[in-house]
Regions:
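Intracellular coupling helices
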Residues: 264-304
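Membrane-proximal extracellular/periplasmic loop immediately following the first transmembrane helix
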Residues: 2-77, 81-82
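C-terminal membrane-exit region of the final transmembrane helix in multipass inner-membrane proteins
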Residues: 1, 270, 276, 339-347
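Small-residue-rich transmembrane alpha-helices
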Residues: 301-347
Length: 347
């Protein structure tokens, strides 16, 4: 997948209403952002927390995403946008292509330097640079003009799949990580749109939510902000992939039902029908048919049925593999010779 969500959580903080007893009137979004940084700092100092990050609309298995574009010479490159603080790489353990791990990625992400997935330009054949050649390039973002903002490509990560049902080369695996500044946070208008992600240390995951909630009112209510909810990323993944999993299970049930009917058909043809045709076979031999002729006749039927069976099995296996790999449309409707052969046999 290119990331690790084990022992990770996403927290959201909301602003109190004026009816709350602890509400402080007159506080601005800038002050709310400062309060949120204080909360993040307190979370990071918990002995059971390994790393804490801020992000906007880019947690794994998110139902939405931000877009981004920059230029390689004159070629526009479009991808997903990871709007994050550096610790995001440590929370989800992204991997640097040079093998140095997530710490080097966190150090590379700055307001003037972005981090890209190594495959971000692979689909752009006209691009002058690909893969490792992108490192160190300074490129214009959004507009290919001299006065446009320019960012340096400071590091490259391994490709990151969007979920288990998209291919590694899908659009969702190509992203640009851009530094999430305080000005950008303030522009969101509400802290509820900001994701606070954290990783719990090994062996500390059991009961973590209960321990955090106990401390929430005392330590993590700052200014007008309070902890709205905390969700394990494993639950986010389950909710996001439920429809795809259900669809896949339905397809497997259909394939199983089809194969079961084929199996029963084979049993009926090769066993019961043969038993009922013993008198016919004896009559044909009495009229001059040889064993070779009988074998050819029955063998032809066997080959047709076996061909149908193996074609169905091949289609089912290919369908399952391609569906989970993310290339359902191309494979199932364009590439499947076995499927075409199966329908030709039926009609």
């Amino acid at each position: 997948m290119g990331f690790d969500i084990e022992n990770t959580y996403v927290l959201r903080f909301e602003r109190m209403t004026s009816k709350a007893a602890a509400y402080q009137p007159g506080r601005t979004m800038k002050e709310d952002v400062a309060d949120l940084h204080e909360i993040v700092n307190r979370l990071a100092h918990r002995p059971d927390v390994e790393a804490v990050s801020l992000s906007q609309n880019c947690i794994p298995y998110n139902d939405g995403a931000n877009s981004f574009s920059f230029y390689l010479d004159t070629v526009p490159v479009r991808s997903l946008k990871r709007w994050i603080t550096p610790e995001y790489f440590n929370v989800f353990r992204y991997r640097n292509i040079d093998g140095s791990g997530s710490e080097s990625l966190a150090e590379a992400l700055t307001p003037s330097g972005m981090v890209l997935s190594v495959n971000i330009a692979d689909v752009y054949q006209d691009a002058p640079w690909h893969g490792k050649e992108l490192l160190g390039r300074r490129v214009p973002v959004w507009r290919n003009e001299p006065e446009a903002e320019h960012l340096s490509i400071a590091a490259l990560t391994e490709p990151v799949r969007y979920d288990h049902f998209t291919a590694p080369d899908d659009y969702g695996s190509r992203y640009a990580a851009v530094y999430l500044t305080d000005e950008a946070l303030e522009s969101l208008g509400e802290t509820v749109y900001i994701e606070v992600c954290l990783r719990v240390r090994e062996g500390q995951n059991d009961g973590f939510i209960d321990r955090l909630i106990v401390d929430a009112d005392r330590q993590y209510q700052v200014g007008n902000l309070y902890l709205l909810d905390i969700t394990p990323l494993s639950d986010v993944r389950t909710a996001y992939e439920t429809d795809s999993v259900n669809e896949l299970n339905t397809q497997f049930c259909i394939i199983f039902f089809l194969l079961l009917n084929i199996f029963l058909g084979i049993i009926g043809t090769f066993w019961f029908r043969t038993q009922h045709r013993r008198a016919e076979i004896a009559l044909r031999m009495a009229l001059g048919s040889t064993l070779g002729n009988l074998r050819s006749s029955d063998g032809g039927r066997s080959l047709v049925i076996a061909d149908i069976c193996y074609s169905c099995i091949g289609c089912g296996v290919e369908f399952g593999i391609c569906r989970t790999g993310g290339s359902y449309t191309y494979a199932f409707y364009g590439r499947s010779f076995l499927r075409l052969r199966f329908w030709a046999l039926l009609f």
